[in-house]
Design a protein with these regions (language model features):
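P-loop NTP-binding core
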Residues: 1-188
């Protein structure tokens, strides 16, 4: 609901987004070509309203799955990444219902680490009731620094989850945070 990928990867400012498709305002899934190998369905801040707008919709947890199936997304792409908001609301429920492999990005800090159990329980519920193909394929440590805190969180994650924690970590990088301010996408 924050549209961070759209902001970070494109100069998109106007036009239809995933919000209009999910709320039935348009049928065609809008796709932007970021580069030859990366396409993006844009989002905007209006996506934050989708939880309210779809709160009474029938089968609201599978709207995104239906949208992606109608657009034959799995037939047209090798990988589809669904960037979820940092909450367990309707958008995240829709993404998990439409997914098979779920990667959990986890900031190497104490509070996100403590929330991992709730995310795991949420995915288990989706797996048991809505999508038997949904499972955690890995945990990706993000904003990692060589600090005692980051190392401690990584150690605890590896003790608790073993090989589910990816070996690769995304280091904290101020240039990534500055890129949208300078109107640069992070791919270039």
């Amino acid at each position: 609901a924050q549209a961070n990928l759209t902001t970070s990867l494109t100069n998109f400012s106007e036009g239809e987004t995933i919000y209009e498709v999910m709320t039935g305002k348009t049928a065609q899934l809008p796709v932007l070509e970021v580069n030859e190998k990366l396409h993006l369905v844009p989002a905007s801040l209006t996506l934050a309203m989708v939880d309210v707008e779809l709160s009474t919709a029938m089968a609201r947890e599978s709207i995104l799955k239906d949208v992606l199936e109608r657009a034959n997304v799995s037939g047209n792409y090798d990988f589809v990444l669904l960037d979820c908001p940092p909450s367990l609301g309707l958008m995240t429920l829709n993404a998990f219902t439409a997914s098979t492999d779920i990667i959990i990005p986890l900031v190497s800090e104490v509070l996100p680490f403590k929330g991992l159990t709730m995310i795991n329980d949420f995915i288990s519920m989706v797996h048991n009731k809505l999508n038997p193909n949904a499972h955690i394929s890995g945990v990706l440590i993000t904003r990692w620094e060589g600090s005692k805190l980051s190392k401690g969180i990584e150690l605890k994650l590896r003790e608790a989850l073993g090989d589910t924690v990816f070996k690769v970590k995304i280091r904290k990088n101020i240039r990534l945070a500055e890129a949208p301010l300078e109107n640069k996408n992070i791919v270039d």
